[in-house]
Amino acid sequence: MTYDKRAATYHRYKVSLATVNGRVQARYVLPRELDGTPYARYVLDRRWRFSTSKLVYDGDRFWLHAVMKRHYTASKAVDESGSDTHSGDSTRVLGVDLNVDGYSAVTSAGGFHGNADHLNHRREQFESLRAELQQTGTRSAHRRMKQRRGNEWRWFDQYAHDVANGIVADAVQVGATHVAFERLTHIRRRISKLPKFQQWFFRRVQEYAEYKLKEYGIECRQVNPRNTSRACSRTDCDCVSAANREGKTFRCTACGYEVNADYNAAKNIGFALLNDLSDSADIPASHTRSLGRARSQLALMSGTLTPAGGFASREWESTDKPTASAVGG
């Protein structure tokens, strides 16, 4: 059952729900320590507001899945003369790289969101507990396993929401018109042993980011990620080599450019979309063309960059990112 704002009234520690027998008040079940919980992150933060919610019954208990919304204020990038670089006919792209280890999502604006290693660890914990309950084989164990399965997917779903929210925040802050993701089909080919869970998680993050970004008029697109992890993202370098990347460090063997490998990939994914939007089939992977008369820009952590190499300094601050020395330029 879905509730809108008329049928559900949210308070700090309880919610009032309309039923066929009148309104029912239910208090939130909260842990002793609130730090780091979705309740502390969204309910206690007055910048977030309740939207719609869905009442779900798992055979044992009722759960209320609430959607939170927040309005962001977009920042502008200015060039050295102080002029706004984002005009009505311009296209500004935010590139996003999704990962199975390290940070779950990295954006070309320097946003580092989620912890894929922690996500994988939680997944292993859930699977281990489920295996123990299956071995027990009792009715009580079966009931607990069913309950844990519901808790498990709610946790992962909330985690996908959190990562998507980080991407949305970056996109709005830099005034992006488009957000570029890697096509999921290519992710599966690139990582042949990618578990179904990771495929589900990547798809969920993209879906949540897409519907959240629609509110701001920002369009999501998917691109072919060919060579995005191997190519140097500097606009004056055409080097594409597997030797450029070692773990989470990208070091170009041609020009010496050194940067976080996932950040480099996010930039290349953004450039790939700029190339796609140009409607030219013969644009090389070195991303050296723009979109004709329309001004095309890639949103970076330090400003905006055109495919031709034109740079404008920033007026925004990225969130949740490592130090500049760890990220690079």
Task: Describe the residue ranges of each PLM region.
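Acidic carboxylate diad motif detector
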Residues: 1-58
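Secondary-structure transition/turn motif
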Residues: 12-24, 29-30, 65-72, 108-109, ...
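Short helix-coil boundary/hinge micro-motifs
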Residues: 34-51, 59-74, 208, 219-221
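Glycine-rich, charged/polar anion/phosphate-binding loops
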Residues: 49-51, 163-167, 218, 238-239
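Short, surface-exposed charged micro-motifs
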Residues: 52-54, 95, 242, 258
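Short acidic-glycine loop/turn motifs at beta-strand connectors
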Residues: 58, 107-111, 235-236, 255
